[in-house]
Amino acid sequence: MSITKDQILEAFAEMSVMEVVELIEAMEEKFGVSAAAAVVAGGAEGGAAAAEQTEFDVMMTSFGANKVAVIKALRGATGLGLKEAKAMAESAPVAVKEGLEKAEAEALKAELEAAGAEVEIK
C-alpha cells in the first residue's frame, strides 16, 4: 500500500514546528540535499531590485528657466539662506537632500519641479 500526497500533507499539518524541522533535517541527510532556497543568478540589477531601497537622494540636475522660483523652493526645503540656496542652484547637478524616505523624496521632487527645476530621485 502506498501513501498518497494528500496523506503526507495531512501528516505534515498535524506535526509541530520542531517535528517538521527534524523531518527536513532527516530528509536532507537521507537524500544528500539541502532545503535552502536556490539562488538564481540574474543580471546586475536583479539583486538591486530584490533589496528594496529605503533611502533616497533628491538630485537637482538643472534649475530650469525660473531660477528665482527654484531658489525660493530650495530655501524652503533646506532652510538655507539666500546666498547658499543660490549657490546650490547654480552648482547643479547637486544633491538637495539625502537619505529621505520615499514619500518625502517624492514631495520634494514635486515641489522643485513645480518651481521649474529638473529633479531626479536616486
Curated annotation (Swiss-Prot):
HAMAP family xref list: Ribosomal_bL12
Task performed by this protein: Forms part of the ribosomal stalk which helps the ribosome interact with GTP-bound translation factors. Is thus essential for accurate translation.
GO biological process, any: translation
Gene field: rplL
GO CC entries: cytosolic large ribosomal subunit
Protein name in UniProt: Large ribosomal subunit protein bL12
Organism superkingdom: Bacteria
Family annotation (Pfam families): Ribosomal_L12 (PF00542), Ribosomal_L12_N (PF16320)
Keywords, alphabetical: Ribonucleoprotein, Ribosomal protein
UniProt cross-references to Gene3D superfamilies, sorted A to Z: 3.30.1390.10, Single helix bin (1.20.5.710)
Alphabetized GO MF terms: mRNA binding; structural constituent of ribosome
Entry-linked InterPro entries: Ribosomal_bL12, Ribosomal_bL12_C, Ribosomal_bL12_C/ClpS-like, Ribosomal_bL12_oligo, Ribosomal_bL12_oligo_N_sf
PANTHER family linked to this entry: 39S RIBOSOMAL PROTEIN L12, LARGE RIBOSOMAL SUBUNIT PROTEIN BL12M
Record's subunit section: Homodimer. Part of the ribosomal stalk of the 50S ribosomal subunit. Forms a multimeric L10(L12)X complex, where L10 forms an elongated spine to which 2 to 4 L12 dimers bind in a sequential fashion. Binds GTP-bound translation factors.
Region forming the signal peptide: none
Organism listed in the record: Shewanella woodyi (strain ATCC 51908 / MS32)
Matching CDD domains: Ribosomal_L7_L12 (cd00387)
Similarity remark: Belongs to the bacterial ribosomal protein bL12 family.
